[in-house]
Each structure stands twice: as C-alpha cells, then as structure tokens.
C-alpha cells in the first residue's frame, strides 16, 4: 500500500505568526495571557497553549480590566476592539495579514457608498469579524441560491469579497452567478482567498486522481480543513477529516492501493507525522511526497511583541 503526501500542507505563515505571538507573550509577561477565540482552529494547538498559561475567551467582558488580550488569526470586529479599549486592555493583534487586507477593503468600499457582498460561512468567526467593519451595508452570501435571493438594483454600487479560507470551486460558482446577475459588481484586482488555502487545495488536486482514499488531518472547526476534504469528495474520492492518528479507522484501508494525506493550515506537522506512522503500522510500505509548490511566506510578529523583545534584549 502506497501513501502520497501532499505538499504544501499544515501550518501557513498566518497560523505560525499567531501561535508564536501567544508563546512569546507568555514568555515575556507570564501567565495569564488572554486570547479572544481559539488562536487557530486546532484543539491540539489550543490545548498546548492552555497548559502554558493561555486563557481562551469569547466575551471580552471575561477579561480582567487592564489585562493583555490577543486577537486570534481570524480577526475581530471594530466593536470588539472598542469593548477592549473600554476595559483598558492591552491589545495584541495576531490577525492574519491576509484577513486584515479583507477588513480594510470592506471598510474602504463601504465608506465610498458601496453595498458589500461578503462571500463566506455565516457563523465563521472570520466572517463575523469582517462583517463587523460595515454591518449596515454588508450582506453575507454562502451559496448560489443566496445570490438568487439578492435584491440590489442596477443603480446600487456593489462590491464583493470572500472569506480567505473558502473552496476555490465554490467561490467560482458563486462569483460567476453574482457577475451574471450584477455585471457592474466590483471586487479586488486579486483574489482574497489566501495563498495557503489555494496552495493546499491545488496540491491536493495533484494527488486525488492517483488515490482511492484521502485523509485530511485537521480540526472539524477548521474551515480550510473542511474545504480540503470536500475538494477530494467532490472528485468522487472516499475522504475523511481526522483530528489525529487516533481517528484513523483500519477498515478504511481495506482494499485500498494508494492513500493520499494532507493537512489543514492550522494542523501541526507533528500530528501529521503520527498519522503517517499509524498508516505504516496499518500496512503502508511506500511513502512519497508530491510537491505542488514551495512556500516561503513569513509574517512579522505584532509590534507589541517585537518592541517588548527589543526592550528586553
């Protein structure tokens, strides 16, 4: 039985920056450090940071006045930032730079009088934060059916933008429907789907046609991990989303010749390696890397972390 490893996979630059932000904050100022929402959507990462002293909260009111609060990679709305200021919290922003780009675009176009069409999943924390930049003029669209139900006129100035972790195929269908209905709709010159989401989906496509089973290592809450599993499934390949090696079912491998393995952008490589070892113990006797592209993107740590490190040095 052969195992094909999709590359790139696992951590992206935004996730690495967010995790390092929490770790460095704990080293610089000690516990507790408060984090708004899970820093990234992966239970192994979150649990590891909890044991080091990070406290994850959903409501800013749960943070003691004057404490340090880190914003997760998914971003937050201006209302959350205002709430933090009222509590005199020391804010450390670990929002992914690519999410910040989307926030900035929504704010800019809203100020210019546009109606914002935000393509994404209604309940995802990234979408909640982005929509909060201009809640009165933002409409969230999740499907082609949602596009059909839009009631804008040809006189309305329209701008669309997407959640950074969506399926390339889904976005293509939705944007095509949007452009057909509203030919005058505007968007950014380049896609707002992040490079890592795109690379992981394209890398997976390189192996799906060669496999009879695809395993995606990622948390059920992780949007990009779910989109990876869907990408394989829509191509008719049996596929499963697993948290770690403990969720691999031996019966999945019965009769299989080639297995594909990838991981979402918030999945640690050590978890992937445990999954590989488990598959070897279950009968895999050949492992091959299939490389789509190499990534060398690095995002600078938030200024409060950088400045504190320099002052300590």
Curated annotation (Swiss-Prot):
Binds 1 [4Fe-4S] cluster per subunit. GO terms for molecular function: 4 iron, 4 sulfur cluster binding; 4-hydroxy-3-methylbut-2-enyl diphosphate reductase activity; metal ion binding. Keywords: 4Fe-4S, Iron, Iron-sulfur, Isoprene biosynthesis, Metal-binding, Oxidoreductase. The active site is at residue 126. Pfam families: LYTB. InterPro entries: LytB/IspH. Its EC number is 1.17.7.4. Its cofactor is [4Fe-4S] cluster. CDD domains: lytB_ispH. Pathway: Isoprenoid biosynthesis; dimethylallyl diphosphate biosynthesis; dimethylallyl diphosphate from (2E)-4-hydroxy-3-methylbutenyl diphosphate: step 1/1; Isoprenoid biosynthesis; isopentenyl diphosphate biosynthesis via DXP pathway; isopentenyl diphosphate from 1-deoxy-D-xylulose 5-phosphate: step 6/6. Catalyzes the conversion of 1-hydroxy-2-methyl-2-(E)-butenyl 4-diphosphate (HMBPP) into a mixture of isopentenyl diphosphate (IPP) and dimethylallyl diphosphate (DMAPP). Acts in the terminal step of the DOXP/MEP pathway for isoprenoid precursor biosynthesis. This is 4-hydroxy-3-methylbut-2-enyl diphosphate reductase. It comes from Protochlamydia amoebophila (strain UWE25). The lineage of its organism: Bacteria, Pseudomonadati, Chlamydiota, Chlamydiia, Parachlamydiales.
